[in-house]
Amino acid sequence: YNKKTNKFVMWAHFENGKNYLDAAVAIATCDTPDGDFTYHGHFNPYGYMSRDCTLYQEEDGTAYFISASRDNADLHVYRLSDDYMNVDCLVHRLWQGEYREAPAVIKGKYHYYMISSFCTGWAPNQGKYAWADSIEGRWSSLKEIGDETTYDSQSAFLLNVNGKLLYVGDRWGGDGDKYFESGYVVYPLKETEDGLEMIYQDTAEFE
């Protein structure tokens, strides 16, 4: 939500429906999060490819767009313009050549954290995370989190609920044709001064 324009701004991965070559960003806006969004077109940030992506908004209103670029080889971090309708600058090219996708970001008690997955199509893989003292600061090397399939999921987004960090992951139906069998998993994240741990639970209740 952009307080200056009073608009909800959506950024999304755009493809043309015929092939997977556009690797672009689409932008849409609406007065409410559940209304009819107005499409404002698509583009490639500074000419770069953009696929799996996420947004992060600071408390002061500064917003960032993070996406898989260069055929998923790198994760790019862009600071957005004040109205969230364009990129203002390219802040980072993270973990170049590591082929990370599905980025998800959260601010914890000690650090900012980013969880991502390797590129294995619909098959789950070992999730990894990194930390930094600020979005625009120096990010750590990648460290493993969860088990070898991230408990059969791929990072979707991270939540801070009353000070508790939660991982929300996509559990894909597989091969694209079984999308109706896909679902979500939610796991608590334990933050320490030494890092981040994903806690597996069969069921969980949150207040």
Language model features with spans:
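Carbohydrate-active catalytic/glycan-binding domains of CAZyme proteins
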Residues: 1-207
